[in-house]
Protein backbone atom coordinates (compact mmCIF):
# COMPACT_ATOMS: atom_id res chain seq x y z
CA UNK A 1 0.00 0.00 0.00
CA UNK A 2 1.16 3.54 -0.77
CA UNK A 3 3.24 4.90 2.14
CA UNK A 4 1.83 8.39 1.55
CA UNK A 5 -1.68 7.04 2.06
CA UNK A 6 -0.61 5.38 5.30
CA UNK A 7 0.88 8.67 6.52
CA UNK A 8 -2.41 10.40 5.72
CA UNK A 9 -4.23 7.70 7.67
CA UNK A 10 -1.95 8.30 10.64
CA UNK A 11 -2.57 12.06 10.51
CA UNK A 12 -6.33 11.57 10.33
CA UNK A 13 -6.15 9.15 13.26
CA UNK A 14 -4.23 11.69 15.31
CA UNK A 15 -6.75 14.43 14.46
CA UNK A 16 -9.63 12.17 15.53
CA UNK A 17 -7.92 11.17 18.76
CA UNK A 18 -7.05 14.73 19.73
CA UNK A 19 -10.47 16.21 18.96
CA UNK A 20 -13.07 13.52 19.76
CA UNK A 21 -13.11 14.14 23.50
CA UNK A 22 -12.29 17.84 23.59
CA UNK A 23 -15.17 20.36 23.27
CA UNK A 24 -14.02 21.46 19.81
CA UNK A 25 -15.84 19.11 17.35
CA UNK A 26 -13.96 16.21 15.79
CA UNK A 27 -16.24 16.33 12.73
CA UNK A 28 -15.20 19.84 11.76
CA UNK A 29 -11.52 19.06 12.16
CA UNK A 30 -11.77 15.79 10.21
CA UNK A 31 -13.48 17.59 7.34
CA UNK A 32 -10.74 20.20 7.29
CA UNK A 33 -7.90 17.66 7.56
CA UNK A 34 -9.47 15.33 5.01
CA UNK A 35 -9.95 18.13 2.51
CA UNK A 36 -6.41 19.45 2.92
CA UNK A 37 -4.94 15.92 2.63
CA UNK A 38 -7.18 14.86 -0.24
CA UNK A 39 -8.59 12.16 2.02
CA UNK A 40 -12.28 12.83 1.58
CA UNK A 41 -13.72 10.28 -0.85
CA UNK A 42 -16.44 7.72 -0.12
CA UNK A 43 -13.96 5.33 1.48
CA UNK A 44 -13.16 8.01 4.02
CA UNK A 45 -16.62 7.42 5.51
CA UNK A 46 -15.65 3.84 6.41
CA UNK A 47 -12.22 5.01 7.56
CA UNK A 48 -13.91 7.40 9.99
CA UNK A 49 -15.46 4.36 11.68
CA UNK A 50 -12.01 2.81 12.17
CA UNK A 51 -10.48 5.88 13.77
CA UNK A 52 -13.57 6.41 15.91
CA UNK A 53 -13.14 2.84 17.15
CA UNK A 54 -9.61 3.67 18.24
CA UNK A 55 -10.92 6.61 20.23
CA UNK A 56 -13.55 4.40 21.89
CA UNK A 57 -10.92 1.86 22.93
CA UNK A 58 -8.88 4.69 24.45
CA UNK A 59 -11.64 6.03 26.69
CA UNK A 60 -12.55 2.48 27.74
CA UNK A 61 -8.93 1.89 28.76
CA UNK A 62 -8.71 5.14 30.74
CA UNK A 63 -11.95 4.38 32.59
CA UNK A 64 -11.50 0.61 32.71
CA UNK A 65 -11.20 0.40 36.50
CA UNK A 66 -14.42 2.39 37.00
CA UNK A 67 -16.25 0.46 34.25
CA UNK A 68 -15.12 -2.91 35.61
CA UNK A 69 -15.99 -2.09 39.22
CA UNK A 70 -19.41 -0.79 38.17
CA UNK A 71 -20.24 -3.91 36.14
CA UNK A 72 -19.07 -6.25 38.91
CA UNK A 73 -21.09 -4.33 41.50
CA UNK A 74 -24.34 -4.25 39.49
CA UNK A 75 -26.02 -7.15 41.34
CA UNK A 76 -25.37 -5.74 44.82
CA UNK A 77 -24.88 -1.96 44.67
CA UNK A 78 -27.64 0.52 43.93
CA UNK A 79 -25.01 3.15 43.09
CA UNK A 80 -23.58 0.97 40.31
CA UNK A 81 -27.04 0.20 38.91
CA UNK A 82 -27.93 3.89 38.96
CA UNK A 83 -24.80 4.86 37.00
CA UNK A 84 -25.39 2.13 34.41
CA UNK A 85 -29.05 3.12 34.07
CA UNK A 86 -28.09 6.79 33.75
CA UNK A 87 -25.76 6.00 30.85
CA UNK A 88 -28.54 4.08 29.08
CA UNK A 89 -31.04 6.89 29.68
CA UNK A 90 -28.57 9.50 28.46
CA UNK A 91 -27.85 7.45 25.35
CA UNK A 92 -31.45 6.93 24.21
CA UNK A 93 -32.40 10.46 23.02
CA UNK A 94 -29.55 10.48 20.49
CA UNK A 95 -30.66 7.08 19.18
CA UNK A 96 -34.24 8.21 18.63
CA UNK A 97 -33.41 11.57 17.07
CA UNK A 98 -30.58 10.08 15.02
CA UNK A 99 -32.86 7.50 13.44
CA UNK A 100 -35.61 10.05 12.83
CA UNK A 101 -33.63 13.05 11.60
CA UNK A 102 -30.08 11.87 10.84
CA UNK A 103 -30.49 11.85 7.06
CA UNK A 104 -32.24 15.21 7.01
CA UNK A 105 -29.52 16.83 9.12
CA UNK A 106 -26.75 15.52 6.86
CA UNK A 107 -28.64 16.66 3.79
CA UNK A 108 -29.43 20.19 4.93
CA UNK A 109 -27.10 21.27 7.74
CA UNK A 110 -23.68 20.29 6.42
CA UNK A 111 -23.06 23.75 4.97
CA UNK A 112 -20.35 26.28 5.87
CA UNK A 113 -22.59 28.82 7.57
CA UNK A 114 -24.03 26.14 9.89
CA UNK A 115 -20.65 24.61 10.74
CA UNK A 116 -19.11 28.04 11.39
CA UNK A 117 -22.11 29.26 13.37
CA UNK A 118 -22.13 26.24 15.67
CA UNK A 119 -18.40 26.59 16.28
CA UNK A 120 -18.75 30.25 17.18
CA UNK A 121 -22.01 29.97 19.16
CA UNK A 122 -20.59 26.97 21.01
CA UNK A 123 -17.57 29.05 21.95
CA UNK A 124 -19.72 31.76 23.49
CA UNK A 125 -21.82 29.17 25.33
CA UNK A 126 -18.63 27.79 26.91
CA UNK A 127 -17.68 31.31 28.01
CA UNK A 128 -21.14 31.69 29.54
CA UNK A 129 -20.99 28.29 31.29
CA UNK A 130 -17.65 29.09 32.86
CA UNK A 131 -19.09 32.27 34.38
CA UNK A 132 -21.50 30.31 36.58
CA UNK A 133 -21.79 31.54 40.18
CA UNK A 134 -20.00 29.23 42.67
CA UNK A 135 -23.24 28.04 44.25
CA UNK A 136 -24.71 26.74 40.99
CA UNK A 137 -23.02 23.31 41.24
CA UNK A 138 -25.48 20.70 42.58
CA UNK A 139 -23.60 17.51 41.72
CA UNK A 140 -19.91 17.03 42.45
CA UNK A 141 -19.57 13.35 41.48
CA UNK A 142 -20.96 11.37 38.55
CA UNK A 143 -22.34 8.71 40.94
CA UNK A 144 -24.67 11.31 42.46
CA UNK A 145 -26.55 12.03 39.23
CA UNK A 146 -30.25 11.22 39.04
CA UNK A 147 -32.07 9.70 36.07
CA UNK A 148 -33.53 13.14 35.36
CA UNK A 149 -30.03 14.63 35.22
CA UNK A 150 -28.95 11.89 32.82
CA UNK A 151 -31.96 12.44 30.58
CA UNK A 152 -31.32 16.18 30.39
CA UNK A 153 -27.67 15.63 29.45
CA UNK A 154 -28.80 13.06 26.88
CA UNK A 155 -31.18 15.57 25.35
CA UNK A 156 -28.40 18.16 25.20
CA UNK A 157 -26.21 15.58 23.46
CA UNK A 158 -28.69 15.61 20.56
CA UNK A 159 -27.43 19.07 19.61
CA UNK A 160 -24.19 17.34 18.60
CA UNK A 161 -26.00 16.05 15.52
CA UNK A 162 -25.58 19.57 14.14
CA UNK A 163 -22.13 19.66 12.48
CA UNK A 164 -19.57 21.70 14.38
CA UNK A 165 -21.33 21.41 17.74
CA UNK A 166 -19.11 18.71 19.36
CA UNK A 167 -20.57 15.72 21.20
CA UNK A 168 -18.22 16.11 24.15
CA UNK A 169 -18.73 19.87 24.13
CA UNK A 170 -22.51 19.60 24.26
CA UNK A 171 -22.52 17.02 27.05
CA UNK A 172 -19.77 18.57 29.19
CA UNK A 173 -20.90 22.18 28.90
CA UNK A 174 -24.56 21.17 28.94
CA UNK A 175 -23.95 19.16 32.09
CA UNK A 176 -22.22 22.11 33.73
CA UNK A 177 -25.13 24.42 32.89
CA UNK A 178 -27.49 21.83 34.39
CA UNK A 179 -25.62 21.89 37.71
CA UNK A 180 -22.89 19.26 37.36
CA UNK A 181 -19.36 20.04 38.43
CA UNK A 182 -16.74 20.25 35.69
CA UNK A 183 -15.38 16.84 36.76
CA UNK A 184 -18.78 15.14 36.95
CA UNK A 185 -19.85 16.54 33.58
CA UNK A 186 -16.62 15.37 31.95
CA UNK A 187 -16.81 11.89 33.47
CA UNK A 188 -20.42 11.40 32.40
CA UNK A 189 -19.63 12.71 28.93
CA UNK A 190 -16.92 10.07 28.55
CA UNK A 191 -19.15 7.28 29.87
CA UNK A 192 -21.90 8.41 27.51
CA UNK A 193 -19.44 8.44 24.61
CA UNK A 194 -18.94 4.67 24.76
CA UNK A 195 -22.46 3.49 23.75
CA UNK A 196 -23.05 6.57 21.60
CA UNK A 197 -19.94 6.14 19.46
CA UNK A 198 -20.30 2.35 19.31
CA UNK A 199 -23.91 2.68 18.19
CA UNK A 200 -23.16 5.37 15.62
CA UNK A 201 -20.19 3.40 14.31
CA UNK A 202 -22.15 0.16 14.00
CA UNK A 203 -24.96 1.92 12.15
CA UNK A 204 -22.52 3.65 9.78
CA UNK A 205 -20.67 0.39 9.19
CA UNK A 206 -23.92 -1.28 8.20
CA UNK A 207 -24.84 1.55 5.83
CA UNK A 208 -21.40 1.68 4.19
CA UNK A 209 -20.73 -2.09 4.17
CA UNK A 210 -20.48 -2.13 0.37
CA UNK A 211 -17.32 -0.01 0.62
CA UNK A 212 -15.50 -2.48 2.88
CA UNK A 213 -12.47 -4.25 1.43
CA UNK A 214 -9.82 -6.57 2.86
CA UNK A 215 -7.22 -4.53 0.98
CA UNK A 216 -7.97 -1.56 3.24
CA UNK A 217 -7.14 -3.36 6.50
CA UNK A 218 -3.59 -1.89 6.73
CA UNK A 219 -4.97 1.61 6.14
CA UNK A 220 -7.69 1.24 8.75
CA UNK A 221 -5.30 -0.39 11.22
CA UNK A 222 -2.86 2.53 11.02
CA UNK A 223 -5.67 5.03 11.56
CA UNK A 224 -7.10 3.05 14.47
CA UNK A 225 -3.74 2.71 16.24
CA UNK A 226 -2.84 6.38 15.92
CA UNK A 227 -6.34 7.41 16.96
CA UNK A 228 -6.14 5.15 20.01
CA UNK A 229 -2.77 6.49 21.13
CA UNK A 230 -3.62 10.16 20.63
CA UNK A 231 -7.07 9.79 22.24
CA UNK A 232 -5.59 7.97 25.23
CA UNK A 233 -3.04 10.73 25.75
CA UNK A 234 -5.69 13.42 25.22
CA UNK A 235 -8.22 11.98 27.68
CA UNK A 236 -5.58 11.50 30.37
CA UNK A 237 -4.35 15.05 29.81
CA UNK A 238 -7.87 16.52 29.89
CA UNK A 239 -8.74 14.81 33.17
CA UNK A 240 -5.67 16.37 34.77
CA UNK A 241 -6.28 19.72 33.08
CA UNK A 242 -9.84 20.19 34.35
CA UNK A 243 -8.77 19.66 37.96
CA UNK A 244 -7.09 23.08 37.93
CA UNK A 245 -8.28 24.84 34.74
CA UNK A 246 -11.49 25.82 32.97
CA UNK A 247 -12.66 25.43 29.36
CA UNK A 248 -12.27 29.09 28.36
CA UNK A 249 -9.24 28.46 26.07
CA UNK A 250 -11.36 25.98 24.10
CA UNK A 251 -14.08 28.61 23.75
CA UNK A 252 -11.73 31.08 22.07
CA UNK A 253 -10.31 28.29 19.93
CA UNK A 254 -13.82 27.41 18.72
CA UNK A 255 -14.57 31.02 17.84
CA UNK A 256 -11.30 31.30 15.90
CA UNK A 257 -11.92 27.98 14.15
CA UNK A 258 -15.40 29.11 13.14
CA UNK A 259 -13.82 32.09 11.42
CA UNK A 260 -11.43 29.68 9.67
CA UNK A 261 -14.40 27.65 8.44
CA UNK A 262 -16.00 30.74 6.92
CA UNK A 263 -12.73 31.89 5.36
CA UNK A 264 -11.87 28.51 3.82
CA UNK A 265 -15.41 28.03 2.54
CA UNK A 266 -15.50 31.52 1.04
CA UNK A 267 -12.16 31.02 -0.74
CA UNK A 268 -13.01 27.45 -1.78
CA UNK A 269 -9.99 26.01 0.05
CA UNK A 270 -12.13 23.44 1.87
CA UNK A 271 -15.37 21.81 0.73
CA UNK A 272 -17.46 21.80 3.90
CA UNK A 273 -20.00 19.20 2.82
CA UNK A 274 -20.43 15.45 2.74
Swiss-Prot record:
It is a multi-pass membrane protein. Its EC number is 3.6.1.27. GO terms for cellular component: plasma membrane. It catalyses: di-trans,octa-cis-undecaprenyl diphosphate + H2O = di-trans,octa-cis-undecaprenyl phosphate + phosphate + H(+). Pfam families: BacA. GO terms for molecular function: undecaprenyl-diphosphatase activity. The keyword Iron does not apply. The keyword Cell inner membrane applies. Keywords: Antibiotic resistance, Cell inner membrane, Cell membrane, Cell shape, Cell wall biogenesis/degradation, Hydrolase, Membrane, Peptidoglycan synthesis, Transmembrane, Transmembrane helix. GO terms for biological process: cell wall organization; peptidoglycan biosynthetic process; regulation of cell shape; response to antibiotic. InterPro entries: UppP (IPR003824). The chain crosses the membrane at residues 44-64, 85-105, 109-129, 185-205, 214-234, 247-267. It is found in: Cell inner membrane. Catalyzes the dephosphorylation of undecaprenyl diphosphate (UPP). Confers resistance to bacitracin. Bacitracin is thought to be involved in the inhibition of peptidoglycan synthesis by sequestering undecaprenyl diphosphate, thereby reducing the pool of lipid carrier available. NCBIfam families: PRK00281.1-2 (NF001389), PRK00281.1-4 (NF001390), undec_PP_bacA (TIGR00753). Belongs to the UppP family. This is Undecaprenyl-diphosphatase. It comes from Variovorax paradoxus (strain S110).
Amino acid sequence: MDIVLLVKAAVMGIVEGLTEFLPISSTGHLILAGSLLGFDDDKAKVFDIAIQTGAIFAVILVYWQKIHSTVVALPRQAKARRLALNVVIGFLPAVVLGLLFGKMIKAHLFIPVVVASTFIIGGFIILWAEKRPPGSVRIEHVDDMTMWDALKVGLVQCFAMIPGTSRSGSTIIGGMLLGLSRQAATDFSFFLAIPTLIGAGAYSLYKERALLSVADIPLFSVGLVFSFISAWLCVRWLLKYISTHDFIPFAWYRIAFGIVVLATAWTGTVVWAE
